[in-house]
């Protein structure tokens, strides 16, 4: 990992995600698929939103071919751009279970919620990585049952009133383990 990155993990709480017990027998063949997609360009308008990882089209496009999908790595990354030094932007993030009632406007009231100043003369212009605590949030995004505690990212961002260009981009990246191909018709 490069020293130009800032790693900002959320503190952990003592909790365990729900999951079904594994079936006995030899495990099925599996593949690990890396992904990365852009969520938002921040710094032009105030933003208060959330992202359900299990519902993202970039992920469902390839998990649709399998019966089971489990996240093995998940991170939110804030990428400052050339406008960041002149137009500092505040970005607040928090990973929560999907069924959490926490809102983007109250991220700092969520245990582990963090706010970053992106840009400015003395603040961060390095990418900021916020890993999802997959030991506390259910990493199973596709299974024989539907889980309501899969990862959700809360996002809140302010914007300088004088900025006309985005100052940073928010991306999600990670790896998902896929197994048990979904049997379907091969004719269309």
Swiss-Prot record:
Record's keyword terms, sorted: Capsid protein, T=3 icosahedral capsid protein, Virion
Example of a GO cellular component annotation carried by this entry: T=3 icosahedral viral capsid
Similarity annotation: Belongs to the tymoviruses capsid protein family.
Chief location of this protein within or outside the cell: virion
Function: Self-assembles to form a T=3 icosahedral capsid composed of 180 copies of the capsid protein. The capsid encapsulates the single-stranded RNA genome.
The protein, known as: Capsid protein
Disulfide bridge map: none
Protein location: Virion
A molecular-function term among this protein's GO annotations: structural molecule activity
């Amino acid at each position: 990992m490069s020293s130009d990155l800032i790693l900002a993990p959320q503190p952990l709480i003592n909790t365990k995600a729900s999951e079904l017990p594994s079936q006995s027998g030899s495990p099925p063949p599996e593949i690990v698929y890396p992904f990365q997609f852009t969520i938002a360009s921040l710094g032009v308008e105030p933003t208060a939103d959330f992202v359900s990882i299990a519902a993202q089209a970039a992920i469902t496009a390839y998990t649709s071919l399998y019966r089971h999908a489990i996240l093995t790595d998940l991170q939110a990354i804030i990428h400052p751009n050339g406008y960041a030094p002149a137009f500092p932007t505040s970005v607040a993030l928090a990973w929560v279970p999907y069924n959490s009632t926490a809102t983007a406007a109250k991220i700092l009231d969520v245990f582990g919620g963090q706010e970053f100043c992106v840009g400015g003369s003395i603040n961060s212009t390095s990418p900021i990585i916020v890993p999802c605590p997959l030991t506390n949030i259910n990493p199973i995004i596709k299974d024989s049952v539907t889980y309501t505690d899969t990862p959700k990212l809360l996002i809140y961002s302010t914007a300088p009133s004088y900025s006309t260009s985005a100052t940073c981009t928010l991306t999600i990246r990670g790896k998902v383990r896929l197994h048990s191909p979904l049997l379907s018709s091969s004719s269309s």
